[in-house]
UniProtKB/Swiss-Prot annotation:
Residues covered by region (LID): 126-163
Subunit structure: Monomer.
Binding residues annotated for Zn(2+), in chain numbering: C130, C133, C150, C153
Homology family: Belongs to the adenylate kinase family.
GO cellular component terms given for this protein: cytoplasm
InterPro entries attached to this UniProt entry: Adenyl_kin_sub, Adenylat/UMP-CMP_kin, Adenylat_kinase_CS, Adenylate_kinase_lid-dom, P-loop_NTPase
Binding annotation for AMP: T31, R36, E57, L58, V59, G85, Y86, P87, R88, Q92, R160, R172
EC number from the UniProt entry: 2.7.4.3
Keywords, alphabetical: ATP-binding, Cytoplasm, Kinase, Metal-binding, Nucleotide biosynthesis, Nucleotide-binding, Transferase, Zinc
Name used for this protein in its record: Adenylate kinase
Chain spans, region NMP: 30-59
Amino-acid positions noted as binding ATP in the UniProt annotation, renumbered to this chain: G10, A11, G12, K13, G14, T15, R127, G200
Length: 214
């Protein structure tokens, strides 16, 4: 099973990708993570990418495709792939088809986690964590049992991510729509796109995705 998992920041894509890895033995292929790892390991494609980035240029589709190709080559044929952050353009979608065919694979599903923008703004802007143990809380949905005291470790220090503000969240939503707009119609024409309500509980979303993969 090879899938593309789509969803804006805050939709729970990272959490669900990890669930797929744990429950189905799949491999998450995040182009950003792979690029950083290749540069750090000084692989041939990593050195090529570093030279481009050192010039202040964007890494080309060809280099990203090389990364994907190398990862699939290293993977066992029975291990499914979760593509995260790729493809983002029609050209990349075409390249992915070629790469998958080379490895006797095909794309089975494109799953989009749908979110309500207003609810997503509320979810993200209200979240905060214990500065000591990292336990997550929310202004409206999950306050500590004792005000100002972490339920887990008893710390009284909390923190918020500086980019968890309404303006940034809405900008991210716009960027996400712009990035996915070119590729969704391609996969919709093939009948591969499935949509899951990303605003449900984590277990509910996981169950909905599992049902699509059966």
């Amino acid at each position: 099973m090879n899938i593309i998992l789509l969803g804006p920041p805050g939709a729970g894509k990272g959490t669900q990708s990890q669930r797929l890895v744990e429950r189905h033995g799949m491999r998450q292929l995040s182009t950003g993570d792979m690029l950083r790892a290749a540069v750090k390991a000084q692989t041939p494609v990593g050195l090529k990418a570093k030279a481009v980035m050192d010039r202040g240029e964007l890494v080309s589709d060809d280099i990203v495709s090389e990364l994907i190709d190398a990862e699939l080559t290293a993977m066992h044929g029975n291990v499914g792939a979760i593509f995260d952050g790729y493809p983002r353009t029609a050209a990349q979608a075409g390249q992915l088809d070629v790469i998958l065919a080379k490895h006797d694979r095909s794309l089975d599903k494109v799953i989009e986690l749908e979110v309500n923008e207003e609810a997503l703004v509320d979810r993200i802007t209200g979240r905060f964590t214990c500065a000591k143990c990292g336990t997550g809380y929310h202004d409206r949905h999950k306050q500590p049992a004792r005000e100002g005291v972490c339920d887990v470790c008893g710390s009284t220090e909390f923190k918020r991510r500086p980019d968890d503000n309404e303006e940034t969240v809405r900008t991210r939503m716009q960027e996400y729509r712009a990035k996915t707009a070119p590729i969704l119609p391609i996969y919709e024409e093939r009948g591969l796109v499935e949509r899951v309500d990303g605003m449900g509980g984590i277990d509910e979303v996981t169950a909905a995705i599992d049902a699509l993969l059966k």
